[in-house]
Amino acid sequence: MDVACMLGANETYDVAKFRVNAKKTTPLTIAPANAPENATVWLLPYRETKTLPQGTVRKAETFRDNYAYYTVALNMPEGTVSCPLMNEAGEVVGLMQQPYKQNDSLSYAVSALFADSLKIGGLSINDATLRSTFIKKDLPKELDQALLTLYVGQASVDSATYVEMLEDFIARFPNAPDGYTYRAQIATGDRRFADAARDMEQAIKVAEKKDEAHFNYSKILYQKELLMSQDAFAEWSLDKALEEAREAERLQPQPIYRHQQAIILFAQKKYAEAADIYASLYDSDLRSAELFYEASRCKAAMKDTLGQMALLDSCVATFNQPYLKEAAPYILSRAHVLLDANQYRKAVNDLNEYEKLMQATVNANFYYLRFQAEVGGRLFQQALDDIDQAIRMAPQYDLYYAEKASLQVRVGMRDEAIETAKECIKIAPDHSDGYLFLGLAQCLKGEKKEGLKNLKKARELGDTQADTFIEKYTNQ
């Protein structure tokens, strides 16, 4: 007989439970109680025999509260590991274990009740013993445990195995919408949109909580239009996604369903409508940094900088000080908006806070960003320190040398600017920036001949700014 699926396993006691494909079988009866000590027992071998090996229970040690591990006075024949141990009523009391040595006068058996108690649970999909065999695993009989298996299985089994699990789930729980929803997600990913649509309609049909089914359909539609809009399917659109979210809210008003509508409206570039919905959610149980951040994006798209800033302030205010890393992305976003609004010193404050939180991951681009804010805020020494750090982290990026030389010229550090510009030229001799700032610093220092020569080189390389300086210093 072929094994259909595993129903459980225990490596410690070396037992497994499985289902077989068989049209007709006569099962043995499992004894309802443990065999007592001194009870007579018989070993039923795999092959038919006229007489059964007989023994006596010498010891019945209890494990896991009510199961017995038997020591039996019985010389165990070869090839009878896992064979049933029977009582005088013909019931199975145990399963034979591997003997310590051949021809030993004592043998061992584990309770048949224990073997029968093995079952598949929601997390059994990750059980090392079950995973060591490639035999198919059964789904749990309880719906909540089977759903847990599906959830965990998304990340722990290959796609073919997962699809097979889904089919088994739908066959066992045909009135549960979850199986159809999961299968629709897979079909959508495979661009089988008609199949996905059928599954979601079935999910809605069988669902007791139809609002949840409509909401799940809305999420699938939104993800498809967001990530696969180039693959047209006439029945699906963002309008359809919005319709499903609104139907979910009609059936059972919940903030999460309104939030879904806001997300879709934003994708449709209906920013004012989305912003209004977000505003209605600020005092709901969805209130969070992410909610305020999403709302701020609506204001940004509407060119409402003040509104965007206010929402980012609310976003950051959801975190207590001292901040944890979770606040870092939002602080950085606010810094970018402050920088764009020419509020340089406030931007620097946010960038300082971000650096403290993300010290191990900040890169050269971060220090260049803060350099720009510091230059705008006239924090020149801090700016020079940051551009030096950017150069240390990305020493072959000529832009940083050019920016450093530019600032050095601005603050009167002419000798330093000349050295920095020469480094820039060494790294990128075909770029104009190094020659421009070298020439400018030299002219400011009184070395007009060399300075004009370098300014003209910058002009040859396409820098139109050089013309202004050439004209200025030629006529002096």
Residue locations for each model-derived region?
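Register position in tetratricopeptide repeats
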Residues: 189, 223-227, 267-268, 301-302, ...
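C-terminal cap/linker of serine protease catalytic domains
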Residues: 95-161
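Canonical tetratricopeptide repeat
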Residues: 182, 216, 260, 294, ...
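Active-site region of chymotrypsin-like
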Residues: 21-27, 51-120
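Helix-start (N-cap) detector for alpha-helical repeat units in TPR-like alpha-solenoids
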Residues: 177-178, 210-215, 253-258, 288-290, ...
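Structural marker of alpha-solenoid helical repeat scaffolds
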Residues: 172, 206-207, 250-251, 283-285, ...
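Conserved active-site neighborhood of the chymotrypsin/trypsin-like protease fold
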Residues: 1-52, 66-69
